[in-house]
From Swiss-Prot:
Its cofactor is Mg(2+). It is found in: Cytoplasm. The active site is at D44, E116. It comes from the Bacteria. InterPro entries: dsRBD_dom (IPR014720), RNase_III (IPR011907), RNase_III_dom (IPR000999), RNase_III_sf (IPR036389). The gene is rnc. This is Ribonuclease 3. Homodimer. HAMAP family: RNase_III. It is an enzyme of class 3 (hydrolase). Digests double-stranded RNA. Involved in the processing of primary rRNA transcript to yield the immediate precursors to the large and small rRNAs (23S and 16S). Processes some mRNAs, and tRNAs when they are encoded in the rRNA operon. Processes pre-crRNA and tracrRNA of type II CRISPR loci if present in the organism. It comes from Vibrio atlanticus (strain LGP32) (Vibrio splendidus (strain Mel32)). The lineage of its organism: Bacteria, Pseudomonadati, Pseudomonadota, Gammaproteobacteria, Vibrionales.
Length: 225
């Protein structure tokens, strides 16, 4: 009999030996009991290493700055959320009542965190080489199409250049909330941007990631104005 998890395992290309790991990876902190944030922490580091290693060997003549920008593009929340939607992760997430009601299963940050948690779970269930193979299979088309150059600028840089080009004031970022233990925090940042009515919210596991997430959202809103 095919369970929902069997279906998800086929989508991600990996069958778990320890089913508890995949269930934990899909459990958001809003749900009761254990949740996926420790797995997310682990998966974030593994993903960054695997992508950095691939870019280093794929682009032997590219400098550190361009490689950093390409990696940032590939591991940012928006890209991870795209992967989550490709796997239809929203159908499998375990959320608390409040997140369910507010549509958390569609939220970029929750989908991105779950993808990182799955990476952490695959690593714990197997080994470094297996998780590398899985990540590279997910990223194959993106790695084949990405190129070094200006298009890889991070969202904060692109937002600043967008505003400067229109002679608008620079964005103002303010940390409005920090929650969680020191090793596992979530930062909430508000970004005030000329041309956007309300401050834009960004969340991330560091201030920098939260600011980048807010800048990405601001760019999307400005492009629709």
């Amino acid at each position: 009999m095919n369970s929902p998890i069997d279906k998800l395992e086929r989508k991600i290309g990996y069958q778990f030996n320890d089913a508890d790991l995949i269930h934990l990876a899909l459990t958001h902190r809003s749900a009761a009991g254990k949740h996926n944030e420790r797995l997310e922490f682990l998966g974030d580091s593994i993903l960054s290493f695997v992508i950095a290693d691939d870019l280093y060997h794929r682009f032997p003549k590219v400098n550190e700055g361009d490689m950093s920008r390409m990696r940032a593009t590939l591991v940012r929340g928006h890209t991870l959320a795209e992967l989550g939607r490709e796997f239809e992760l929203g159908d499998y997430l375990k959320l608390g009542p409040g997140e369910l009601k507010s549509g958390g299963f569609r939220r970029d940050s929750i989908l991105a965190d779950a993808v990182e948690a799955i990476i952490g779970a695959v690593y714990l269930d197997s080994d470094t080489e297996v998780v590398r193979r899985i990540i590279l299979s997910w990223y194959q088309s993106r790695l084949e199409s990405i190129q070094p150059g200006v298009s890889q600028k991070d969202p904060k840089t692109r937002l600043q250049e967008f505003l400067q080009g229109r002679r608008n004031p620079l964005p103002v970022y303010t940390v409005t909330n920090i929650k969680g233990e020191a090793h596992n925090q979530e930062f909430t940042v508000e970004c005030e941007v000329a041309g956007v009515d309300k401050p834009v919210i960004g969340k991330g596991t560091s201030r920098r990631k939260a600011e980048q997430a807010a800048a990405e959202t601001a760019l999307e809103q400005l492009s629709n104005v």
